[in-house]
Every structure is written in C-alpha cells, then in structure tokens.
Amino acid sequence: GKDSLSPRDQLTLEIARMLREDFLQQNAFMDVDSYSSFDRQLRLLALILHYEDLCRDAIAKNVELPALFAIPARERLGWAKYAAAEEYAANYQQVHDEMDSEIAALIEKAGEDA
C-alpha cells in the first residue's frame, strides 16, 4: 500500500489529493466556492505548491512525514478556499506564514534530535 512508498512518493500522493480536493473540487452550494477569480485560484495553487516545496525540503532534513501532514496550517490550507472574497488575500498570506513557521520549527526539532 501507500506506506510502502518512499516519503517523497507519499508526499506526491498527498499533494495530488490536495490538488483534487482543495483546489479542483468545488461546492456549488457555497457562494464563495461556486466561482473564484483567476487571482484567487492562482494564489491557492501557489499556496499548495509552496507547501509541497517546504515539505520536500523538510523531508531532506529528516522531518517525519506524519508531522508535516499534521501541522495546523495544513488543515487551514484545506479550508482557505472558503474565505470571503474580501478576505482571501490576507487569509492566504496568514496560512503561508503559518506554514513557513510551523515547518521551520519541525526542521529545527529534527536537527536537535539528530
């Protein structure tokens, strides 16, 4: 199963799932998600790809994959698409900054444990 894959391959599967569920999947019953501007879509995609880059760097520095998937900013990323139109830019930036700090803390902890 999935557990037999390398951490990098498991991350690829997780990013693919995020792209499918957090980026491509829409909820037509929610006004904020039934239509998104190009800028909003671009920023959300950039946020997911930034998470992937941070995770790949962290994996190279011996951070465990479950810890990367469990950061609070990861869950907030999944809910970011539901931010109101006038708030999404600030919301996305906040999630971006939280991802940076939370993953940096995991990298620092992995360095101390090594």
Model-assigned labels for residue ranges:
Residues 2-114:
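Conserved catalytic/coupling modules of large nucleotide/cofactor-utilizing molecular machines
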